[in-house]
Amino acid sequence: MAKRIKTPADIGALVRIVRKEQNLRQDELAGVAGVGLRFIVDLEAGKPTAQIGKVLQVLQTLGCSIDILAPGERRK
C-alpha cells in the first residue's frame, strides 16, 4: 500500500492502520520497536516533534519503508 505522506498526522495514521492490521496493541508495538508506549501514542496522534530516528525504527518494525522523491522525480 503506497501512501503519500504530507504531515506528521499522515505518518501517525499509517502507523495505526498497519499496527492494527498486524493485530498489535500499542504497548506491544512499543516493546518490539524498542520505544516507549508514550512515543507510540504520540506518534499515532501525529505529534510533529517526534524524533525521526524513533519514527524510522517503528516504521521498520512494522515492515514499512520510506521513499523520498527529489523534485521532478516520479514513482516507478
From Swiss-Prot:
Q: Could you confirm whether the keyword DNA-binding appears in this record?
A: yes
The domain of life for this entry's organism is: Bacteria
Please give the SUPFAM superfamilies that the UniProt record associates with this protein: lambda repressor-like DNA-binding domains
Q: Which UniProt keywords apply?
A: DNA-binding, Plasmid, Transcription, Transcription regulation
Q: Name one Pfam family in it.
A: HTH_3
Report domain HTH cro/C1-type positions: 15-69
Is Zinc one of the keywords UniProt gives this record? no
NCBIfam families given in the database record? couple_hipB (TIGR03070)
**Protein name as annotated:** Uncharacterized HTH-type transcriptional regulator y4mF
For this protein's source organism, the top of the classification is: Bacteria, Pseudomonadati, Pseudomonadota, Alphaproteobacteria, Hyphomicrobiales
